[in-house]
Amino acid sequence: MITKLFFHQVGDNKKRLIWYWKLLIIIAVLAIVIYSWIDNFSSFNQFGLNVFINNITSLFTPNLNHEYTLVRFLAQTAFFVTGGSFLGFIFAILFSYWTAFKIQPFYIALPIRLITIVLRAFPVLLFGFLFSNLFNKQLAATLTISWFSFLWNTKYITTFFENSNLKYFFNKKIREGSGFKAFWTTIFLSENERLWLFFLYSLEANFRWTTLLSIFGIGGIGQLIVDPLSIRVQFDLVLIPLVVLITFLIFIEVVVFLLSSFVFEKNSEDLRPILKTTVIEKRKWKRIIFILFIVVLISLSLANLVTIDYRINDAEFLQDFFNQFFQLKSNLFSSNDPNINPILMLVKLTTQAISLISLVVIFSILFGFISCNLFKKRFSISFKILLLFVRVVPSILLFRLLDPLFLEAKTTIILVLLINHGSSYGQLMSINFNKANQNIINNYKNHGMTKGFILWNYLLVENKPNLINITSDAYDSVIRDLILFGSFGGSIIGSRITNFFERAQFDNLGSVTIPLMVYLIAIEIIFLSVRLTRISVFKNYLY
């Protein structure tokens, strides 16, 4: 009876939501999105344009007499990012084996999965501050990168395992009786190209993330950009390290693109006798490049491990922190002030996330559409290069430049994160659009259909599952970024975490952070439940 109230039958085993319920949902979603826009976008600051122009002028008038020590900071960055990313990736592979529902029994995978969800719920701000207070800069940076890489690679690699065809794994597991051996031979070795791609994308993201790490006082070349933009803003000290950082990031992007396109990408090989020599030669070069890649990776990781100072600065600090962290202050929750009550802070954070994610989805589709193969190659490549340059510009620099233009910092943060996430997810949407059936697209073109018509009636329909996945991933990501930018006014809750930690008010810190963690855990469990339903884990793998 309840089913008939909401759905109507369109086939033997297929039901569809009744149109007026669908319309009601659309109206409700639009109302929430519009409210979030109104609540989070402030007016343009009419006096800020001159400040913005002066900041741009100062940025492009570098101080040539300042000593920057670029080589040392760049080498330090390469060491701790590579070493931390590699260490986190190794642990992610192991944990993904134990958390994949299609590989492990449900009673094993679920508890370990929940542990990783809880660990991921700790704000990056919190661990960044903890590590930077306990260890020296290089060790703190390595641990933060490792922690971040481990938790997020575990999530994505586990999803990859659960979406894979594991027939050969189960057959080998039954024959040999060893689950890990079967996993190693049928999944890890056969899919190692795809797994290395996860590492490359993680490595690239971590290099771009180094400037944000410097907020915690962690070293690296990002520190040369963050320090002049902190208390006493000095744009004239930013350009030279910025050019070096952007050049280095573009080099990393090019290396990742070449490795992912020619070394780690699975391509079908033409084994005709006439081309056999070419195929063998190609395999040989791929093997040589792969060996060189591994040698460089291990060398940088070992260099990082050797040069780290492993001393702990203040062991008692950690004990004091956790003794106070779980002593929640009930008076904060009874306040009606959204700047004090943690629950009201979460409501505000949610409206910020909704306003941002709605724009990210729109601009991701737009950017992906403009840079896909529907347009002339020269135009799409030019736009991809533009997105690349936008993506590698540090977010903190964009914030300092754009902030005078608006009356409230929260508007600036949303625009900065929109630029960052829109360009990143736009690249992903472009890849998905380019996988569409070219024959169908040509058929639309032959019938005189416009590019906009093809986007709306074919590309978006075909990529609906990808768009849903991107939206869920982006929602989780933008919430964490809003928290991270709290020290710049990005979110009340992020600002409170920063202030309470700096003042050593760890009981107040716990009162704000624990509800936030529960909120993040709830969101991830909801997304996980949707995914479990899609892979039918309860039906096929509950044993």
Curated annotation (Swiss-Prot):
Protein's UniProt keywords contain Hydrolase: no
Protein name from the UniProt record: ABC transport system permease protein p69
The species this protein was found in: Mycoplasma genitalium (strain ATCC 33530 / DSM 19775 / NCTC 10195 / G37)
Spans through the membrane: 18-38, 78-98, 115-135, 141-161, 211-231, 237-257, 288-308, 354-374, 379-399, 413-433, 482-502, 510-530
SUPFAM superfamilies associated with the record: MetI-like
Subcellular location: Cell membrane
Keyword terms: Cell membrane, Membrane, Repeat, Transmembrane, Transmembrane helix, Transport
InterPro entries hit by this protein: MetI-like, MetI-like_sf
ABC transmembrane type-1 domain mapped to chain residues: 74-256
